[in-house]
C-alpha cells in the first residue's frame, strides 16, 4: 500500500455501544480479503484475557501493549491495524497518522468521553486526522432510550478504572443526572 491507500476509521461512543463489536467486524472483513491484520489492546485491560472481547463474548486475537510505541516493528508488517480502547493510548493520534501515511488502514475503537462527560484529549486529537468517524449509541440501562454517556457506579474518581457492567452503565442525558 502507498501512503494514499492508508486511512483512519475512528469508532467512538459510550460503554456498551458496540465499539469493539464493530472493530472486530471490520477487521474480520479485511481478514477475509486476505489482508495482513494486527489487533492491539491495552495491556491493563485483563477482563477477557489476551484477545479483544466484546461484552457478549465475541473475540479476536490481539497483541497486548502498554504503549503503541512498543509495537512499531509488528505494525510495520501489517496492512490493517485495529486498536481497541484507544483512549488509553496517549500517543494514539501520532501513531495513527504515521501509520496511515505509511499506507496502513487504522480502525480505532474508543470512548469519546469520561464518566464525567469530559473528552479524552488524545481521541479529540485523532478526530480531525480520521477520514471516517462513527459515533455509536448504547441503550440507557434505566429508561431504555438511546444512551450516549457512560455512568460510573460507586465513588471512585480516577479516570482509568477498567471494568464492565459491574462498574459502568450506559445512560441517556436525563438518567445521567440520577
Curated annotation (Swiss-Prot):
The keyword Lipid biosynthesis does not apply. The active site is at 85 (proton acceptor). ATP binds at residues 13-20. SUPFAM superfamilies: Glucocorticoid receptor-like (DNA-binding domain), P-loop containing nucleoside triphosphate hydrolases. Substrate binds at residues 115, 159-163. Zn(2+) binds at residues 140, 143, 172, 175. It is an enzyme of class 2 (transferase). It holds the Pfam family TK. Its EC number is 2.7.1.21. The keyword Metal-binding applies. Gene3D superfamilies: 3.30.60.20, P-loop containing nucleotide triphosphate hydrolases (3.40.50.300). InterPro entries: P-loop_NTPase, Thymidine_kinase, Thymidine_kinase_CS. Belongs to the thymidine kinase family. This is Thymidine kinase. The gene is TK.
Amino acid at each position: 500500500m502507498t501512503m494514499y491507500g492508508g486511512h483512519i476509521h475512528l469508532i467512538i461512543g459510550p460503554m456498551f455501544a458496540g465499539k469493539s463489536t464493530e472493530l472486530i467486524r471490520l477487521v474480520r472483513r479485511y481478514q477475509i480479503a486476505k489482508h495482513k491484520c494486527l489487533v492491539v489492546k491495552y495491556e491493563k485491560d485483563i477482563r477477557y484475557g489476551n484477545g479483544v472481547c466484546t461484552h457478549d463474548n465475541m473475540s479476536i486475537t490481539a497483541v497486548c501493549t502498554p504503549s503503541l510505541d512498543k509495537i512499531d516493528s509488528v505494525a510495520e508488517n501489517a496492512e490493517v491495524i485495529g486498536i481497541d480502547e484507544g483512549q488509553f493510548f496517549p500517543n494514539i493520534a501520532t501513531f495513527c497518522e504515521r501509520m496511515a501515511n505509511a499506507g496502513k488502514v487504522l480502525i480505532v475503537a474508543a470512548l469519546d468521553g469520561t464518566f464525567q462527560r469530559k473528552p479524552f484529549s488524545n481521541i479529540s486529537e485523532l478526530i480531525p486526522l480520521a477520514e471516517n468517524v462513527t459515533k455509536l449509541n448504547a441503550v440507557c440501562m434505566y429508561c431504555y432510550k438511546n444512551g450516549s454517556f457512560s455512568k460510573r457506579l460507586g465513588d471512585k474518581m480516577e479516570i482509568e478504572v477498567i471494568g464492565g457492567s459491574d462498574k459502568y452503565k450506559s445512560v441517556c442525558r436525563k438518567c445521567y443526572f440520577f
